[in-house]
From Swiss-Prot:
Keywords: 4Fe-4S, Cell membrane, Iron, Iron-sulfur, Membrane, Metal-binding, Molybdenum, Oxidoreductase, Signal. Belongs to the prokaryotic molybdopterin-containing oxidoreductase family. It catalyses: dimethyl sulfide + a menaquinone + H2O = dimethyl sulfoxide + a menaquinol. Inhibited by dithionite, sodium hydrogensulfite and tungstate. This is Dimethyl sulfoxide reductase DmsA. Exported by the Tat system. The position of the signal peptide cleavage has been experimentally proven. Can also be exported by the Sec system. Changing C67S: Electron transfer from the 4Fe-4S clusters of DmsB to the Mo-bisMGD of DmsA is blocked. Little effect on the coordination sphere of the molybdenum and only minor effects on its redox chemistry. The lineage of its organism: Bacteria, Pseudomonadati, Pseudomonadota, Gammaproteobacteria, Enterobacterales. Catalyzes the reduction of dimethyl sulfoxide (DMSO) to dimethyl sulfide (DMS). DMSO reductase serves as the terminal reductase under anaerobic conditions, with DMSO being the terminal electron acceptor. Terminal reductase during anaerobic growth on various sulfoxides and N-oxide compounds. Allows E.coli to grow anaerobically on DMSO as respiratory oxidant.
Amino acid sequence: MKTKIPDAVLAAEVSRRGLVKTTAIGGLAMASSALTLPFSRIAHAVDSAIPTKSDEKVIWSACTVNCGSRCPLRMHVVDGEIKYVETDNTGDDNYDGLHQVRACLRGRSMRRRVYNPDRLKYPMKRVGARGEGKFERISWEEAYDIIATNMQRLIKEYGNESIYLNYGTGTLGGTMTRSWPPGNTLVARLMNCCGGYLNHYGDYSSAQIAEGLNYTYGGWADGNSPSDIENSKLVVLFGNNPGETRMSGGGVTYYLEQARQKSNARMIIIDPRYTDTGAGREDEWIPIRPGTDAALVNGLAYVMITENLVDQAFLDKYCVGYDEKTLPASAPKNGHYKAYILGEGPDGVAKTPEWASQITGVPADKIIKLAREIGSTKPAFISQGWGPQRHANGEIATRAISMLAILTGNVGINGGNSGAREGSYSLPFVRMPTLENPIQTSISMFMWTDAIERGPEMTALRDGVRGKDKLDVPIKMIWNYAGNCLINQHSEINRTHEILQDDKKCELIVVIDCHMTSSAKYADILLPDCTASEQMDFALDASCGNMSYVIFNDQVIKPRFECKTIYEMTSELAKRLGVEQQFTEGRTQEEWMRHLYAQSREAIPELPTFEEFRKQGIFKKRDPQGHHVAYKAFREDPQANPLTTPSGKIEIYSQALADIAATWELPEGDVIDPLPIYTPGFESYQDPLNKQYPLQLTGFHYKSRVHSTYGNVDVLKAACRQEMWINPLDAQKRGIHNGDKVRIFNDRGEVHIEAKVTPRMMPGVVALGEGAWYDPDAKRVDKGGCINVLTTQRPSPLAKGNPSHTNLVQVEKV
């Protein structure tokens, strides 16, 4: 029988020690993603086994945040209040069938998000300085009027290019409520009705890998489904940590473990931090200095080339630039990859295992052993997460890592992979149309603070402006919907604070959110949004292996306080801006949903009727091809199915990158190269700055949060405390013991947080889980453990992306 947790427990202030006592779960088990604390310690598959009160309703909802999974939630409601949360109980719960999509501990804590004391209750306008969090309550009518009047004024004075939609992924999985990419949001639809807005490209998650592998494979680099690992003999993960980032029953970690049980594939994890993806399930962990993955690959490639472990036939048929046979005529002599690795290229340095060892910290004999294993084991699933690319040299590193799959001919086959992150099967479900943006100009999503500060100085060749040679105006208005990148998730918080404090620069900031986040405190107008539990929507899957699904995210309870849906807000603004009919097309939110669902049923005939789906809660469909294999058609017939690269082949040497390197204006230390070489980038461990700041600081996705979402849920914070991870050798030098308060600092800021002394970190490296809520004192010393106090706003060379894992710091005991 289901054990229901008393409301008194749910409502209580929970200390870490008290949580252990309350749930009877201690030590490592408490933090395990396999548990659903404190809601249930037993998985129940059949609804009939759960007794419900006569006045209790069970309504389907969803967790729609940006974790890489989307999970169904079954809300138990009594008298209009959510009492407790369960997850998917449909299907045969067989890995090879329509298995259950079980939510992790984050999704199961949704009740605590809905009833959180941080909930925004009514519209407010700022009365203090930005960032102080001082607001006064206003009516919805006043809020709409202020926004509409000022937006019209700014468009008249500066043009639509001065209006910017900031990055926000808090409701990434929604259809009506979708918050990213900006062009797919209801705010974008509103702005498109009013003349458009300044767009952005790239994202904080994957800017460098998207740009880097575009020059290798053409477009977004696809990967094999993780379910295809059942055909693999070897799994190699570079900075890929699905055990924490995509840890639900609908996510990659489930497929990884289930598939490995079938194939018994060896798994090697290459990461500065021993992650939960390992946790005893891996066969080998190879710790590596952050930002040196390309050097490791080059050392591996040296062994594979000199010992004839490469797939020469694959390289000759499918690739450009491996050796002189396929090198473009425009390239310099010995400009090919093989020459670079063997030391016959321009630098004259052979990339031996000993050379790589000095850079990476990986012993040379281990590099030789790993090269031989990868080169002689096929098929091999070689993949990279998005941690290695979040560096100053991230674009070029992603191209280097993919070389292991290319050199061994593992691309386009079952059990192999492209070297990118895993792919998945998806259904063609129709989302809300947002019309066309009349403004063609866009900037990197990471450069918006510069666009406020020096917009008209930003150019295409220096700053990556797209659509025109330069910006004409600075950003004067920001829409910040369902996102915390206004301050918390954007790098170099102290610089951002200084820029946003001056309201003569960016004159209007509108924040739409459910909670008083760190970013919400910088709003001029603050609008309270409904949670996913307070409105109707569809939630679509993400990293879902070879079983795609759609969730009916029904309205569970009435909107709390004065909260409104994003559709109602934007419709009311459209009315004041004179574009109501164009925006709504005469439909309510539910009418739009029924309209989109009817279109989706045409594309997916197996979908039930709208009302049947509402009762059913989730629709699942397995990939009819069995396993998704990236670039399979290209492998089978490269002439009939060319890639979208200029050559139609895999471009090891990219003439397009050579042209960019010759024309762009780059600061000293930035490198763009036609080959996937190793370059340290700025602020690496080799930087002279390491004499002052001798530790590398990297980030990771912590299992208690999804970026900053769920960062204010008490039980999750208690179960998985925010701590700085440090190796015992580095701690001993500084007199630091486990649990000590430490200060982490560099020229950009200072953070005070407890230390976690653990051999799970490589010596010379410390780590902070990203997404902790920024909590500064009067001196702007952060007490919340927010890594972005310490990160830099200097962008990466090619993507102009966030190098969040490229940081040098010092650590001292407080």
